[in-house]
UniProtKB/Swiss-Prot annotation:
Pfam families: Ribosomal_S2. GO terms for cellular component: small ribosomal subunit. It comes from the Bacteria. The keyword Ribonucleoprotein applies. Keywords: Ribonucleoprotein, Ribosomal protein. Gene3D superfamilies: Glucose-6-phosphate isomerase like protein, domain 1, Helix hairpin bin. This is Small ribosomal subunit protein uS2. SUPFAM superfamilies: Ribosomal protein S2 (SSF52313). Residues 264-295 are annotated as: Disordered. GO terms for biological process: translation. InterPro entries: Ribosomal_uS2, Ribosomal_uS2_bac/mit/plastid, Ribosomal_uS2_CS, Ribosomal_uS2_flav_dom_sf. The keyword Ribosomal protein applies.
Length: 295
């Protein structure tokens, strides 16, 4: 059983997870996740965000525990570096620049591009191999390598389709989501008030634009993956002292087991009274602080 800790509503509030988009930009399919509105901005129900985040974290934990591969995807500017940082920390995979059409559904072509990238790197690192090339040709090869790295650096060791897709901003990453749906790859995603949660197996209602929010999500995702990796390596008898040093290699070398797709969670039920009180008190405290600042 997972030992993923419960998500703290105050932590979500401090990171601005509750701020949705302007009410005029909402997607009605997100109605059940919206607490209300303030100053023409939708406020996300963090009681549901906290509960559904725990469910999503458990899905990540179980996937990695069973030797599965998790692919993190967010190509928006404010998330790009953060998603790469935390995916690398937990030994998983990522796409943080342009999503190339067919990255999942046309893997043969993508694998060919990865092979091309590997060959370019080997050539450019070998002084003898560069003999006979002009400066312009070497410069062209370097540019091609950098262009390929932007798209492929985070998946170059991904030898097959992932077992779980984790997305921040479902609107921007709709192509990745559509490809995952076609291949029956379960999806964890942060869904803002302008998002469509229909194809998301593990939705997390939350702000998908704030850097603080994005960093919080990624930290929680990475922690869950690392806990799953720890359990996987314990079961395999791997020296835990060497875990962080060999995180990526340990994941790549293991056989992949398919995580069965869980049922969709459209709305959490029976949120306990303590959680209700915590959320409402936190919102009230925020309002009081705002009024004090404006006094």
């Amino acid at each position: 059983m997972s030992n993923i800790s419960s998500v703290n509503i105050k932590e979500l509030l401090d990171a601005g997870v509750h701020f949705g988009h302007k009410t005029s930009r909402w997607n009605p399919k997100m109605a059940s996740y919206i607490y209300g509105e303030r100053d023409d901005v939708h406020i996300i129900d963090l009681r549901q965000s906290a509960a559904l985040m725990s469910v999503a974290l458990n899905a990540i934990y179980e996937t990695v525990k069973k030797d599965g591969k998790v692919l993190f995807v967010s190509t928006k500017i404010q998330a790009s570096d953060i998603i790469a940082e935390y995916a690398e920390k937990c030994g998983q995979y990522y796409v943080n620049h342009r999503w190339l059409g067919g990255m999942l559904t046309n893997w043969k072509t993508i694998a060919g591009s990865i092979e091309k990238l590997n060959k370019l790197e080997k050539t450019l690192e070998n002084a003898e191999a560069l003999i006979g090339y002009t400066k312009k040709e070497i410069l062209d090869m370097s540019r091609k390598k950098e262009k390929l790295l932007l798209s492929l650096a985070g998946i170059r060791n991904l030898n097959s389709k992932p077992d779980l897709l984790v997305v921040i901003d479902t609107n921007k990453e709709h192509i990745a989501i559509n490809e995952a749906v076609k291949l029956n790859v379960p999806i964890v995603a942060v869904v803002d008030t302008n998002s469509n949660p229909d194809n998301v197996d593990y939705p997390i209602p939350g702000n998908d634009d704030s850097i603080r929010s994005i960093r919080l999500y990624c930290r929680l995702f990475a922690d869950a993956a690392l806990q799953g990796l720890e359990e996987s390596m314990k079961a395999s008898g791997v020296d835990m002292g060497a875990m962080h040093e060999h995180t990526d290699n340990a994941l790549i070398s293991k056989n992949v087991s398919k995580l069965k797709q869980a049922k969709k969670f459209s709305k959490t039920k029976n949120i306990d009274e303590e959680t209700n009180t915590e959320f409402e008190q936190a919102l009230n405290d925020t309002d009081e602080n705002k009024n004090a600042d404006n006094a």
